[in-house]
């Protein structure tokens, strides 16, 4: 169902996990369709996890879990997601970095909500990369939905078409729907990985992958094909700048100040 992270063929030693979860809709009583304020007494069933899918970056093997995988528990209570929440947490505990679309706002918080509900320990809090945040911060796509970005970039855009009936049929125990849900969940990983690989060279706040490597390495992708690319200057310092030949990041700089002590003494700055 899941396994330890790999070193991506020796290219990168950081364990980067891409993942996606699918959840059941809440079931509530309402007096109408629009502008409803749902009180706690109107809640029939809170949302719960249906499936999750994950893969290690640049590795072909995909891991997943779903409620029907645990037949005895599913037969006893088809809404009890403890086993699949635990299996996802176990996999994430092996990761240095996790990647998801809207992961910081939804997936990570939602997972912790279920962990505390079931009395399970917190995950080891790997660093996170949220491709939705990247899209909003660094680009101006007409839509920041994962599918729409994939279509715009022409990467992994052939996603299975679904509607709400798929979720409803899973909740109602339709096994064909469950198989379709797993396929849908797994297929989300394809555009997620391709988009992440395209975007990471544009990020200035990516977790520094250089700390996982020996010698010089790109902070965004861990690649070692760095070429000198001019200089980066601050008001008081000068640093070597590099371009990564693997991900295209051209904003890498060394940490050594190239200005000697005498030159720095002669520098003047504005008082305000």
Regions found by a protein language model. Name each.
Residues 213-218, 241:
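Residues immediately within or flanking Cys/His clusters that coordinate Zn2+
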Residues 225-229, 253-254:
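Short, non-ligating residues that shape and space the ligands of small metal-coordination modules
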Residues 230-241:
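Short linker/helix segments within small regulatory modules
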Residues 2-92:
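Conserved RNase H-like, two-metal-ion catalytic cores of nucleic-acid enzymes
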Residues 218-221, 244-247:
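Short cysteine-rich clusters marking metal-coordination/redox-active sites
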